[in-house]
Design a protein with these regions (language model features):
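Iron-associated oxidoreductase/ferritin-like identity signal
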Residues: 1-124
């Protein structure tokens, strides 16, 4: 969407993030299969898509706000049951999500501080 709107820089960053998310899903699916589980990839949550760039980032930010505590809880559970391989996978994902959270927070704050239009110009 961002590239279609003319925001190449923002589109490239979000594309990188989407590939990162796909890799996270692959790692989790591989681990679940290794543990003789069946991954549930059919359960979909509400998709949050904004109608303009800053709103899109705010939607992504809300997803990270929920994901980070969930990941921390899952890491604690893995430690409790001594599943250190799953814990390490989840820690790696947590690191990535925290970086994305920080980037999103910074971009949203910048759009507010320098003005939405100025920020959007910087994303072209």
């Amino acid at each position: 969407m961002f590239k279609d709107w003319g925001y190449e820089k923002l589109g490239s960053k979000e594309y990188e993030e989407s590939i990162d998310e796909m890799k996270h899903a692959d790692k989790l699916i591989e681990r679940i299969l290794f543990l003789d589980g069946i991954p549930n990839v059919q359960e979909m949550h509400k998709i949050m898509i904004g109608e303009e760039p800053v709103e899109c980032l705010k939607c992504d930010f809300q997803i990270e706000v929920k994901a980070i505590p969930d990941l921390k809880e899952a890491i604690q559970y893995c430690e409790k049951v001594s599943d250190f391989v799953s814990r390490d996978i989840l820690r790696e994902i947590l690191d990535s999500e925290e970086e994305h959270y920080d980037w999103l927070e910074t971009q949203i704050e910048l759009a507010d501080k320098i003005g939405r239009e100025n920020w959007l110009k910087s994303q072209m």
